[in-house]
Amino acid sequence: MPKGKLFIIEAGDGSGKETQTRLLSERLLHAGHRVIPVSFPDYASESSMLVRMYLRGDFGTQAEDVNAYAAAAFFAVDRYASYRMKWGQAYEHGAIIIADRYTTSNMAHQAVKLTDAGERDAYLDWLYDFEFQKMGLPMPDAVFFLDMEPDAARHLILARARQKGMVPDIHEQNAAYLARTHAAYRMLAARYGWVCIPSSQN
């Protein structure tokens, strides 16, 4: 049996990835496909412990307090555990996987910590080798980038935090970091041929 498909819904924080992942999964299910939606980080799993520690500021209150390679490894290990324990076999047997974030998030969120273009390219090459070659995670068949302006996304982040009584994580609290990450997403989308979907808070 041929392998399944892996589709990624990608965007900056607060841009509606969870909603779009659910809607696409439901549409494909209704069309008769075997579909498994997944979300990263996998907060319900022990594998996300280092991610949770990083995002709540245990290693430093600024994203830049943890270097790109270390932070990327936290997220990659969480993905590896999810793949091996939750959806890898289904994918290998033909299921469609719809992921809310993936390696593509590591590409944007950690690359912005590197100001030199050569260092960013070296990081992206390392990440490709680390996650797809060394760890053996499957490569996406398509990436859909929800392109929402960071000011609009930040408004939604803060509204969601108030509604749920939560504290935004160290990425979400930093407006300048969110703006740089959004610019990185646009650059990556152009470089790697992601499908760009203009989005707004409406």
What is the role of each PLM region?
Residues 25-26, 54, 114-117, 160-163:
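Glycine-rich, phosphate-binding/catalytic loops in enzymes
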Residues 133-137, 187-188:
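Arginine/glycine-rich "motif VI" loop of SF2 helicases in the C-terminal RecA-like domain
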Residues 4-8, 96-98, 194:
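Residue-level preference for the first positions of well-ordered beta-strands
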Residues 99-102, 127, 136-159:
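Conserved phosphate-donor/acceptor-positioning beta-strand/loop module used by diverse small-molecule
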Residues 31-135:
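ATP-dependent small-molecule kinase phosphotransfer cores
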